[in-house]
Amino acid sequence: MAIKSSIHIKPCNTKSSEAHNRRTAEYMRNIGESRIYIVPELSADNEQWINPDFGNSNLQTHYDNIKRMVKEKTGRAMQEKERERKGKNGKIIKVAGCSPIREGVLLIKPDTTLADVKKFGEECQRRWGITPLQIFLHKDEGHWLNGQPDAEDKESFQVGEKWFKPNYHAHIVFGWRSEEHTSELQSH
């Protein structure tokens, strides 16, 4: 049965995305003792999938390889920054920069599986030609409640003495280009 959800896709911050998604030791140290929105005891419930075609490079290396390939194939540098130009009517038009790696956050339910999200990624690839490179299910994020939850709140639960309201979601990192059409990187 299909369920409704939402996803917000934007250019991926390749320098910090993997640290957050993989919960690296350095990332966990940097968010500090307060663990504002992550409960480490719940991190074992997180799941991940890396597209076998992606290989074992990290996102920044992959991004740098794309930049180099664009330069080799087109003779020009990849246009990364947003820029403005004047239209025929004299109005200023913003032109988006190229973002070959993008990340979307998909809202999920507590019982959503990695297979469910992979199926969603496959549908995105079929419909729009965007390739899922990495998928991370996060079931350890949320926020602490002040006191007990409302009676109709069925998701919050107790961790020690405090009540926690989970924010179940999945991060999907998409490749937004094809090897054959490097000069036609999608920028919208």
Predicted regions and their residues:
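N-terminal nicking endonuclease/strand-transfer module with a His-rich metal-binding environment
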Residues: M1-S183
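Short "domain-exit" segments at the C-terminal end of structured domains
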Residues: E184-H188
